[in-house]
Amino acid sequence: MEQEIDQIVQAITIASDPTQASLYQQALAYISTIQQNANETWRLALHIFVDQNTEGHRKHPAQARFFALRVLDEFFDNRFEPLDHESFQAIHQALTAYIQSEYVVGSAEADASFLRNKFSHTLTLFFLCTYIDQWPSFFTDLFTLIRPTESATRSNFNRHISLLFFHIVLEISGEVADQIIKSARPYNAARHARDARVRDAVRDRDAARINAAVLTIVVEGAEQMANLHKSETSSRGPRELEGAVEVVDWGIRTFGSYVGWIDINLTVTPTTVPLLFNLLADSSLPIRLATSVSLLRIVSKGLKEPGDKLQLLKVLSLGQVLDALEAKTRAQQIEREESYREALGKLLNVLGLELAKLVDDCSDEDIRAEASTYITQIQPVMLRFMADEYDDTCSTVFPLLQNILTTYKRHRKISSNPLDESKRSFLASLLQVLLAKMKWEEDADPEDADEDDNAEFDKMRKELRTFLDSILAIDQVLVTDAVKTLALDTITAFKNGVSIKWNDAELGVYLVFIFGEINKSMTRIAGGKGRAAFCQAPAVVDKDKRKATDYSDYPLTTHGEMLLALVQSGVASFPHRTVSLQFFETASRYTDFFKIRKDCIIPTLEAMIDTRGLHNENLNFRSRLFYLFHRFIKESRNEIPPHISGNIIDSMRDLLLIEVEIPAAEDTEIDPLSEAIKNSQFDSQLYLFETAGILTSLLCKTPTQQTAMLLSLVKPLMDDLSVSLQAFSKGGQDLLPIVKVHHIIMALGNIAKGFPDYPTSIPEGHILPPLEIFTEVAQAILVCLEAMNVYKPIRDATRFAFARILATTGPTVTSYIPQLMGNLLAHFEPTELVDFMNFIGLLIHKLQKDMFDVLDQLIGPLSAHITSLLTQPVSGTDEHRAHIETKRAYLALLNNIMASKLDGIFTSERNSSNFEVLLESMQRLAEDVSDPASEKTAIMFLNRSVTVWGQPSSSENGRETGHGLPGFERFIYERLVQTCFRVPSLPQFNLKDGQMMVVLHEIANLLQVICKIRGHEAYNFFISVFLPSQNWPSETALDFMTKLRDLDGKGFRKYFTELIRSSRTS
């Protein structure tokens, strides 16, 4: 055995030293085998842990002994039956001797304190295996060791054994009663039953003695602490005080660990309650925190009788205690002790929730009334915790507050009586606390703060908003008056020159910002959305008279008054960017207000454009303003006088310069071009280009001026584009010209995006934008694409820009599409396929029949490529996702073609040879139940196919682009009908799956379309050929055909679903 032990110890030493590379892995594998075979190796482990040398010291190093405990853990942890007698005796004697030598007379592993915690866990596992049948005297034996035999000792109890006892009880509580620990490991019925038996046995045999021992040691430790505090000059020094604090701390933790699973009459007594309250106010923070947890567990302990629970809470009188402690700690504000106030808040929260359970669940009216009174009594202290400057403390009472407000809302719904004064007073006080908590700290700096800090503040504001919304549902006037008063008082004070702190100003503006949200119900009552939210206009204004109506004649709503005061106050000039940013956020959110108070537009625009906004020195601030300015202009464009749009553009020209910097490569695995393209500042700048396009579009009634303005925006970009293309053509590795071309193409696309879409039918008197300029832009972009089509970012930018130019110019640039497609497909990555098909779908939507020739050339190669792609095997999650996305985009494209009546491309001279292959591909996808969404879309395509090509070949039924195809009926009867009945019969077709039900409904639609298009012929086929071949009884077949012919779509879908469901269960 000695040789084996030495071998294990040597392996552990090697495994603890990764520098021994040659033997490291071998040693790890060896000791892993030792641990896995704990049933055979536990004796070796026991010796390694307890053996001593001739001098009485532990024989083996600490890391070896720690590993030995892990082996013993493995041996005990998987054992749910008693040990054999010989094994039990060997372990019992060894561990008892170890405790005697190390804890009773020794230093309790002073040189390796981590072994203490590990040993207490191992001993606990041994206890769980043996307590019921083999070591029932476990606690009795332990208690005899706690009191030292030497009467000269200053302490009555052995400190080491006391702490070991505490740790063991804590471990036992964790193993047999802690639901968090239990839920964290896989359920094991044998373990669950064993733990329940141990828990019951401890309750019956030793619970009272354990509790008495814990409290006795705690009381002695507390007395010792008090004596040491009195004699601060004692030579015993702080070490003894530290030791006493540790004992009391662990003792109270132990007490708190078992109060939830032993008799409450043991833990809540005339002795324990005063002790706990004394310790709750102790000078030691760890003791106070441990005591608060113990009290929390007492309060939350479940009792069968509501009366008993109420009596428990009355005995504790926690409300009064917490009131006093909250006031005391708030006055002291001791640094680093905020965790104590947080613990007190949690305790109050649980107390309130337990009382609320009595109010909600108890049938005894007296108990409910008394519990409700107690909740009312603790509301003031709850509000004081809510007002705490630390968010962690404030949020401890959120669940209780939510419960109280939910109760108020519930009563409000069932009663039309006014809210009683006490509740209204509480809500008014709460409202003031909430508004104060929504404010930034004065010394905070949102601009320089960590993103996580700002996110936490925003999260807190949102949570406070939910409470505000709850009060709103209870007493709307109370909330709106409070918010309005605080916002207007702050704004007015600033306007009048009163010195306002930045955080007060920001809150005032923020309240105007959220008023539209918290006041939704009032705006609905007043007439709803839009202008009606800001002025008291008639509920109905004749549609023809709306444009001529002067809404400024109508009085403002409350929100309208707040916004008017906000604009007129000049708060946009507040010398703190957080305040001015909040102003701009508010202005851009409520643009409908500016439609009724047009005199507010110019001052707001001025603030947005000058150094308060777009031209602010702070880069991040400017970036956000680019978006807000764009939003304001876009939503208010019809209210902006066209004659000032040129001035606005001129004032922002310096911001339209495109500057490119190539970042230094930090990671060789990242594509440097993609990294250079990613630029959040440029992404924000694109909003300005679109805004410039919007402002230029406003000059539509003066075409010459509009052309000049558009040219002044586009020409510098086109010149820059030419210079960058020439630089690229010279060769070299410089990424700058490529990035510059990308950015310019994106900018040109965004300018086009600012113009309205080309009309489907041009109305009389409509003035088109300068199409010739956009044509030149399209040509220039194509030249760049042809030269740079090997670069994906250039292809992406071109696709975007062309989509926007086509939306603006309509068929004007259609002639460039073949060249565009050729260059986009010249170099193609699989990831671009979905974007490309979506792009084609957009062109179809915009250009309709003008896309026929392009699609005629494109659809054949594209279908062949995708069909090949979809038949390839898939490996990996990412590849599977890409496969599905490609399939869905392809099916969407095909359906777009059919919906736009461009179906002729599938049967054209160029593509007719592939038509049957396409139909077979669609049929396969329609039968693939592994992807119901794609399956449904494929059936939709087949549905449309029947409508177009399945018509009887007669001149009266023909149509120019969708006449029937001779022979298509064979495909319908031989293939599609089979599919309609094969799919629902597949074993994988799950009728309980909502997506599968959608597929089934689409199949029902297809059956009806077939019969509608083919008429009597189809009915004869079903009744005479298909259904008999499927062995349908003639009555069932006749019923099916009758329903298919006579029911509407909804009725037949319901019938067909029930038919399939019954056929699968029969």
From Swiss-Prot:
User: What's a GO cellular component annotated to this UniProt protein?
Assistant: nuclear matrix
Could you tell me one molecular function GO term of this UniProt entry? small GTPase binding
Question: Which family does the similarity line name?
Answer: Belongs to the exportin family.
User: What gene makes this protein?
Assistant: LOS1
Whether Glycoprotein counts among this entry's keywords is no
Record the organism.
Laccaria bicolor (strain S238N-H82 / ATCC MYA-4686) (Bicoloured deceiver)
Q: Which InterPro entries match?
A: ARM-like, ARM-type_fold, Exportin-1/Importin-b-like, Exportin-T_C, XPOT
Q: Where would you say this protein principally sits, based on its record?
A: nucleus
What keywords appear on the UniProt entry?
Cytoplasm, Nucleus, RNA-binding, Transport, tRNA processing, tRNA-binding
**Role according to the record:** tRNA nucleus export receptor which facilitates tRNA translocation across the nuclear pore complex. Involved in pre-tRNA splicing, probably by affecting the interaction of pre-tRNA with splicing endonuclease.
Q: Which domain of life is it from?
A: Eukaryota
What is this protein's record name?
Exportin-T
Location comes to: Nucleus; Cytoplasm
Q: Which GO terms describe its biological process?
A: tRNA processing; tRNA re-export from nucleus
